[in-house]
Amino acid sequence: MTPKIRAPFLARRTYIKSLGALGLLGVTGVPVRGESFAQSVAPATLDPILPYDPRYTALIRGFNQRFEGDPSYIQLCASPQQVLQAVQSAVDAHLRITIRGGGHCYEDFVTNNDQGVLIDLSPLNAVYQENGLYCLEGGCTLWNVYTRLYKEYGVTIPAGSCYSVGVGGHIAGGGYGLLSRKYGLTVDYLAAVELVHVTKDGKAQLVTIRPNALNPAECDLFWAHQGGGGGNFGVVTKYWFKNLPIAPPVAYLTNIAWNWPELHQEQFSQLITNYGNFFAGHSAVDSPYKDLFTLLRVTHKAGQQIILTIQYVGDHPELIDQFVQAIAPQGIRYVSQPTSQDPHRLPQTPGTRKLSWLEATQILNGSGPNQRGKYKSAYMLRPFTAEQINVMWKFLTMSSYANPQALVLVDSYGCQVNAVSSTATAIPQRSAIMKLQYLTQWVMPEEDRIHLQWIRDFYTAMYGPPGPYPD
């Protein structure tokens, strides 16, 4: 079973758990100054989207098509002042509030708000620089952020690959992506957060919080936004960042695959073992492989191929071949032009491609079509055990469950991510070497039970009934 991550006891973690949604008692912050162009031209209010509005049925669903809500209304907000008004109106009416940025939430935490208020931040999406800091408004999506930061300032954030993910929840959860081994997590660059919260007497307030505030509660709240999750502490209207890294000038992309029909269990075990062992030995801050990021898509055999995607953004692209040689199992060839129909794969071009970083980021977009799905995650502190690899083989070769969209995605982790103390932010997994995502996707509602049972049985077999230790 996977070693469980047990973070040291932190009073701040208790603080996070003690806060209700939007109820941030004792936090005053500092006055909000200035406004973006989008705010200056936004109307005082936007009309709510009610159930009879033709847009309503489209907006009560997000990325995961399993979930459909029934809110009393959907309130679009194009400025922090509109968010402030929307929150106050909901509080006055005693309506539950949920928040949506990109709508990419995997579980039913957003649209599941029957007769409540869904605050949609998508119109609040400006990206700009002011007083030496970079501002991302709460409704931005990642592709919007990448293109604006790259084209206008030449910098980036080390966030995720899915273009449609909203920054509001993604950054509050840590902000991990393909540049994290090189640059760390997005929250490591966070300088301030502007948000709307509610006082104990029911008054909505728009405040800006910083890590060096005199008020300890404000410092704790800022810390919580560095990985404590989104939607729990208020409605984030702006993130401010300092010293963002320069975007890499080029990126080298390689895509290789192993054909399932040619793969025996011994070779499968060797591949998974070698992959884990490599990152156990190359996840230190000073690793020569810190510019290397990999995504191993260990698909169900119905998907025909196990696909490895490699991005390298350093000065020694020959390290790509060295990595492949280190992890490739013996006795089976890999193909350098995968033929899988996986919607997330790279275009079918053999060998390594040298691209601009922005073009590579666009190619590696992992959003795919909106479907029904179930997702689970875990972090690995050390390589897979033989027992775990046997469990993976069992569930990924199961003939009674043949879904080509079922897989385990094993991302490389560590290096600059782990340069930061596990107590400095609300991210405790600063010693992990791999990040796992178990997922299965499908289309038909009547198949829900089959797919949910498979992934739950798989996850339980990997970690035991309690699962990995959450904190």
Predicted regions located by residue number:
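Soluble FAD-dependent oxygen oxidases
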Residues: 2-12, 16-471
